[in-house]
């Protein structure tokens, strides 16, 4: 597997932050709780596959093969028509805002959600990135053949999780406890007086 840090981008940072800091939750009127890092990595890993963009730099993509899906979540059918009317563009914030509002029913004429009835974003496994990825694949993204892309989505999610775990990992206790040399100590080391 390639160095995960090479796929990190501003768009990915924004998506992870919005999902984990409660911003996305607020957009759903708290219907969906703030995501754990594993849940956020699972959603981003799935979106990477859906968009074909390994760093989420292109989120407003139109599916080439069947021409049906569009956007970060590759909305199809009625969900695609609502997406086209909302026109969130390529901005990751607007893409996630659209997803939140669509989930809570804003774009459904009957006031019901086009996907929220599944409760798929409310029931994602919290601490297992593979289980979370599979849950979202089956219940939220729902491709025609989930097995065709399952492993790629899982690998994407694991890469994303690794990136953000590395960024949030606390420094080792040894590194924290090691005293930092002051200017006098540094000068004494030069003359061989201090170690």
Predicted regions and their residues:
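Extracellular cell-wall/glycan-interacting regions and their flexible linkers
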Residues: 1-41, 147-195
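Peptidoglycan-targeting cell-wall enzymes and recognition modules
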Residues: 2-18, 23, 48-128
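Short, functionally critical alpha-helical segments immediately adjacent to catalytic or ligand/cofactor-binding
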Residues: 37-54, 99, 135-137
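Surface-exposed interaction patches
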Residues: 98, 107-110, 135-146
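N-terminal secretion targeting segments of exported proteins
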Residues: 112-122, 145, 153, 158-160
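Extracytoplasmic mature domains of secreted/periplasmic and thylakoid-lumen proteins
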Residues: 121-129, 135, 139, 147-153
């Amino acid at each position: 597997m390639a160095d995960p840090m090479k796929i990190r981008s501003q768009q990915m940072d924004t998506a992870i932050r919005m999902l984990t800091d409660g911003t996305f939750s607020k957009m759903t009127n708290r219907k969906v709780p703030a995501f754990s890092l594993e849940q956020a990595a699972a959603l981003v890993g799935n979106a990477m596959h859906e968009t074909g963009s390994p760093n989420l730099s292109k989120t407003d993509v139109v599916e080439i093969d069947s021409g049906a899906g569009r956007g970060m979540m590759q909305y199809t059918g009625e969900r695609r028509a609502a997406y086209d009317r909302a026109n969130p563009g390529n901005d990751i914030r607007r893409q996630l805002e659209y997803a939140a509002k669509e989930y809570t029913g804003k774009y459904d004429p009957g006031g019901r959600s086009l996907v929220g009835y599944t409760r798929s974003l409310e029931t994602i496994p919290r601490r297992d990135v593979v289980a979370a990825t599979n849950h979202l694949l089956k219940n939220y993204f729902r491709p025609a053949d989930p097995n065709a892309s399952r492993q790629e989505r899982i690998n994407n999610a694991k890469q994303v999780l690794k990136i953000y775990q590395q960024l949030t990992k606390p420094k080792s206790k040894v590194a924290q406890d090691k005293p930092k040399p002051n200017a006098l100590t540094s000068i004494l080391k030069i003359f061989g007086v201090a170690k």
